[in-house]
Amino acid sequence: MLQQVPENINFPAEEEKILEFWTEFNCFQECLKQSKHKPKFTFYDGPPFATGLPHYGHILAGTIKDIVTRYAHQSGFHVDRRFGWDCHGLPVEYEIDKTLGIRGPEDVAKMGITEYNNQCRAIVMRYSAEWKSTVSRLGRWIDFDNDYKTLYPQFMESVWWVFKQLYDKGLVYRGVKVMPFSTACNTPLSNFESHQNYKDVQDPSVFVTFPLEEDETVSLVAWTTTPWTLPSNLAVCVNPEMQYVKIKDVARGRLLILMEARLSALYKLESDYEILERFPGAYLKGKKYRPLFDYFLKCKENGAFTVLVDNYVKEEEGTGVVHQAPYFGAEDYRVCMDFNIIRKDSLPVCPVDASGCFTTEVTDFAGQYVKDADKSIIRTLKEQGRLLVATTFTHSYPFCWRSDTPLIYKAVPSWFVRVENMVDQLLRNNDLCYWVPELVREKRFGNWLKDARDWTISRNRYWGTPIPLWVSDDFEEVVCIGSVAELEELSGAKISDLHRESVDHLTIPSRCGKGSLHRISEVFDCWFESGSMPYAQVHYPFENKREFEDAFPADFIAEGIDQTRGWFYTLLVLATALFGQPPFKNVIVNGLVLASDGQKMSKRKKNYPDPVSIIQKYGADALRLYLINSPVVRAENLRFKEEGVRDVLKDVLLPWYNAYRFLIQNVLRLQKEEEIEFLYNENTVRESPNITDRWILSFMQSLIGFFETEMAAYRLYTVVPRLVKFVDILTNWYVRMNRRRLKGENGMEDCVMALETLFSVLLSLCRLMAPYTPFLTELMYQNLKVLIDPVSVQDKDTLSIHYLMLPRVREELIDKKTESAVSQMQSVIELGRVIRDRKTIPIKYPLKEIVVIHQDPEALKDIKSLEKYIIEELNVRKVTLSTDKNKYGIRLRAEPDHMVLGKRLKGAFKAVMTSIKQLSSEELEQFQKTGTIVVEGHELHDEDIRLMYTFDQATGGTAQFEAHSDAQALVLLDVTPDQSMVDEGMAREVINRIQKLRKKCNLVPTDEITVYYKAKSEGTYLNSVIESHTEFIFTTIKAPLKPYPVSPSDKVLIQEKTQLKGSELEITLTRGSSLPGPACAYVNLNICANGSEQGGVLLLENPKGDNRLDLLKLKSVVTSIFGVKNTELAVFHDETEIQNQTDLLSLSGKTLCVTAGSAPSLINSSSTLLCQYINLQLLNAKPQECLMGTVGTLLLENPLGQNGLTHQGLLYEAAKVFGLRSRKLKLFLNETQTQEITEDIPVKTLNMKTVYVSVLPTTADF
């Protein structure tokens, strides 16, 4: 049953009801069942950690995924949607370390790995319930029951298989490399992890001296921002090709050597130093210097504390002398290795432990955290006379993405996957992927791939998938395990879990006589696990082998732009290494969601609203649409603003809901008042003659076509603005322009066509918007589907809108010419509105004329066809169309496109710009025709110049106009005041106040009311306006309008005082209508004969009770009144022809159709009299004079629209009704005969009133 739609809606509350509906009918699982045998659409969901609550970044990516997978399902695919959880790695361990106060490996050793991992396992799914609640509340359909977790043994086994494939291909090796190292997490990070969290920091900036052994009065000067690396210094490096100088420091009296180009780093003035010698850097090669500290003097045997040369030393910063600590800098390591200062088998000079503290080798600073030791080191250098300058330096520095602590660079033995040798293949596979936006593939991701480095996959941690390598003590024998079965076979143990506590103790017998092989201690980088998820989530290749291979690569993935150096990268590396192909076909990359001030969202700073509170306040649909309709979907950043979500609710969802509500209201009215059942069947809907119907249907089909194209290309950022714009077009244009039609004011046939059009468009819009706003579309659909003719339904199951397939384009409905015509009309109306706003003239006040000037006669022809809408929307009396600019003083002027021309013309732009602005109207008219013009020797085209119209108000005869234009048209609006128009405007203000009170009372159009009014004092301007516009007001509000006093018997709904143009107006609405209705039985008539159509009324009795009309007389009266001649008439009610024996009184209030014989196509059945009327009450006739009756009805017009009755005619017709044509009468508005109807009261103001008829006495009466 069709439900009435409330005026006010609580979107979050309604969404909760929809969630209950989905749960009750298990809608998500049901849709998966329905699509089971359809083609597969493969989707991979990147696994988040459940150790924290979902934030806006998760919500955004989840919304994109939900939209695309819903779209894929509704496009005819089967889409498995499994949620995944990242359970291992630093995020989990860091939480445990904080909770338990664990500071390093020693603390874990004391606790034991078994207990440590049990602690980690206990918190892995800490917030899983909150995740499930939030994700579900957002409307995302995804399978939590069939999820995957990286801690499942099956998942871990597949990760082992992936690793073994790489190992067998020779892509895995062990090496020492200077890596980003997290001292808080006690583990190295990969290069891409270290790039995820840069911050601007202030570090020490020190200039240190290195006296030469050959002459200790001369010192090299090196610069560093990491003083803590100086105790590990083994060399300095200079550029062999750059110019170096020996100078005398005037103030200090010291002899120093540095790069000439870097003198400014130490000295502001040239007078501060004296250059003694110049020489290339190569001159310094091999010179020895005195070490800063004596901790590693033994390294001198290998050539340490020597000047080395390498071109990596640049002139952009420092002194051109770079201090080398090879185990704390990648370039330092390379250069020292090249000069044999260190070797692969050297004992590392790396006196810093996993927690970032100096070891006992550095005796002066042992146990100090390196960053804290900076001050102590600087103080020691100063005391030793080795410090030249100490300041601070602000620069961008990497922080640990998990612990948010500064990283250090440190050499550690690690396991690597060779990536550098597959860069070309990675780039080729990247080119096979479709990226949205494409720029990410070409720039950010492509550039990252070009510089890809070997991937450190090992972590010196505990809670993770163990790397399945069993090795001999000397690492010469290595066995890589690829499955549980293989390990069971080689170790002889039964295995149920693969975490460290379950496998670390297992040994494998050596095949080379090296005793037992033990597993290495490292676990996998958690990115290796997430990069393996396509295989591991289905336990490939141990299970689902064919299913996986048939569905690989994935059709679609989506994540944030930060994943270009994370999940996107690891997916591509592993798929390329394993199969030589990309892991996905299509990817959408979103930007970052920032706080409103542009800063990163921070729980500590509390600079963003809680997502759950936003959903509770505005609903999930509003949040989804806000995020998706923003730059963030184009991989740009979004500054999250709560008011943006509120505006989506206000500007999109609410107007859309109101259009839906308006449709339902009028369908219910149609059923209640006209007894017409509304059922929509797109196969039987007739083509509407109304141009706006054809336009909105065409516009919708164009939108569907656009939607298909852009969604297939994953361009959500183009689709959403068009959908939102369509909501605006539908609500602010179509519904607004057709309100009267939809209410039935233009006849029922036209009303039904308008309702069918609105229904069709709303249903199609709901189907298109279902992936984007799943809640509101479901809410609307559950009511709309009641009105769909079951015969027309093609989908097998129509319970939910999300079961329906997306609409397909109906080419036969597309009419580009009509779309263009309406677009022209909209431009005119919008230009007119701008003028009204500029002059502060409300739309309620009518204006005389609008002039539309356009160079294209075809455009004016289009505008002409829609003239009545311009009149209604702009409230003007007359539309004038013209191509004659000169008549109205219109000139063309030009403005250059600064961005386009400035970029192209560069220095010549200024002269060209000046000349463009000086082009004459005649020159620009020629440019309009040809599309090209030469200015200052440069050929310019349409895209280079913007043309605009200008209006000279002083030109003769146009002073009353105000103008506004766009690139195509100019409109002139006559804004001179006119009293009749001002009066009408005031009457519209009264209507506005009445309708607002109706809204306050939550009344619907079918609710009967009476409106009472009282102006401040009788005889005022406001009072006279209301009295003279009573009919106009009544026609609009569809309720009787009466002056005070309010009848004591009336039930008052609302009473309010308001100010109108300085006058006070009191309005009262009461329950029920006091309209008397026609006193006599009547039928409405539609006359369709002789090629014309007319409307009118026939009274079946008059006075009441005097029934003399049968079918034959009815046809005769029709022939007489409506001028239908020489035609054999047939009369129909609905589709049934009326016969002679039909009791006409039984048809009272119905609409009959009179034709030339054929049955009508559609009958309007209205219970409201089509023509204006008054009821008559005879007061004082003698009994013998009123044998015909004392109550009658008089039609003020018939046929419809012909109402020329005068006061004398009214007296004559009243006497005629009662058979009193020989008597003189007086007419009154009240029974007490105190308000006589005289000639100065317009007859049309009496519509629907009761007129009291008094018979004047004659001499015979005395």
Curated annotation (Swiss-Prot):
Coiled coil location: none
Reported tissue expression: Expressed in liver and muscle (at protein level).
CDD domains: Anticodon_Ia_Ile_ABEc, IleRS_core
Binding residues annotated for ATP, in chain numbering: K603
Keywords: Acetylation, Aminoacyl-tRNA synthetase, ATP-binding, Cytoplasm, Disease variant, Intellectual disability, Ligase, Nucleotide-binding, Phosphoprotein, Protein biosynthesis
The protein's Enzyme Commission number: 6.1.1.5
Modified residues (Phosphoserine): S1047, S1049
GO biological process, alphabetically ordered: isoleucyl-tRNA aminoacylation; osteoblast differentiation; tRNA aminoacylation for protein translation
UniProt-annotated location(s): Cytoplasm; Cytoplasm, Cytosol
Reactions that this protein is recorded to catalyse: tRNA(Ile) + L-isoleucine + ATP = L-isoleucyl-tRNA(Ile) + AMP + diphosphate
Positions of short motif 'HIGH' region: 48-58
Residues the record lists as Phosphothreonine modifications: T1058
GO cellular component annotations of the record: aminoacyl-tRNA synthetase multienzyme complex; cytoplasm; cytosol; extracellular exosome; membrane; nucleoplasm
MF terms (GO), sorted A to Z: aminoacyl-tRNA deacylase activity; ATP binding; GTPase binding; isoleucine-tRNA ligase activity; tRNA binding
HAMAP family: Ile_tRNA_synth_type2
Similarity section: Belongs to the class-I aminoacyl-tRNA synthetase family.
Physiological role: Catalyzes the specific attachment of an amino acid to its cognate tRNA in a 2 step reaction: the amino acid (AA) is first activated by ATP to form AA-AMP and then transferred to the acceptor end of the tRNA.
Record's protein name: Isoleucine--tRNA ligase, cytoplasmic
Organism expressing this protein natively: Homo sapiens
